[in-house]
């Protein structure tokens, strides 16, 4: 199986797990239950969770299949027994490996009724992603993506969190190039056919 097909398949598995978890996020459920569900879907497709056992540092392997963050937690929360409540805003991030190639995705949802401002933040962040994707074209420059994300977010009176960036993805979960969510257009590596990028946006 070619590398492009493997990455597509890993993305398909991630999308299936994403849909299952999103549907299961309800008041009373725990983030640990969401973690177990994601792992079940991933493994039932013959894939391996990307995050479980991943070592950002040699001494600290990540213990779960998903990152699950509540409300003010920006990213990389570890699932546990905390129950999801009405009005929570939760973010889920995870990946899957197929034939040695990674897929990676994240989403944020409101649980039941949330404030108008919270929903607007979710909507603006989502649209910022699509603005960045529009600039991910062969012959463009990496920071064309960065600039589009920043311009849309700031035009809607939000800010990008600069400490967290997107990245290349393939045989490793995190590969070069890093993809910041800010900057001037027309800079950085030339975008070429076959590149795989994971855009990672956090707005406040």
Regions found by a protein language model. Give the residues of each.
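Translation machinery proteins
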Residues: 41-75
């Amino acid at each position: 199986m070619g590398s492009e097909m493997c990455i597509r398949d890993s993305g398909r598995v991630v999308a299936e797990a994403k849909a299952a978890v999103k549907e299961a996020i309800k008041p009373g459920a725990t983030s640990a239950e969401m973690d177990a569900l994601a792992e079940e879907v991933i493994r039932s497709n013959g894939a391996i969770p990307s995050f479980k056992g991943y070592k950002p540092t040699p001494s600290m392997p990540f213990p779960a299949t998903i990152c699950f963050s509540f409300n003010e937690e920006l990213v990389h929360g570890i699932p546990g027994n905390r129950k999801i409540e009405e009005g929570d805003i939760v973010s889920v991030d995870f990946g899957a490996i197929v034939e040695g190639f990674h897929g990676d995705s994240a989403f944020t949802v409101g649980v039941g009724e949330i404030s108008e401002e919270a929903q607007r933040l979710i909507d603006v962040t989502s649209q910022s992603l699509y603005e960045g994707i529009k600039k991910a074209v062969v012959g463009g420059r990496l920071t064309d993506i960065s600039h589009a994300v920043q311009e849309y977010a700031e035009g809607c009176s939000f800010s990008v969190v600069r400490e967290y960036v997107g990245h290349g993805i393939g045989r490793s979960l995190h590969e070069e190039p890093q993809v910041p969510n800010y900057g001037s257009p027309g800079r950085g590596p030339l975008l070429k056919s076959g590149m795989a990028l994971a855009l990672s946006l956090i707005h406040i």
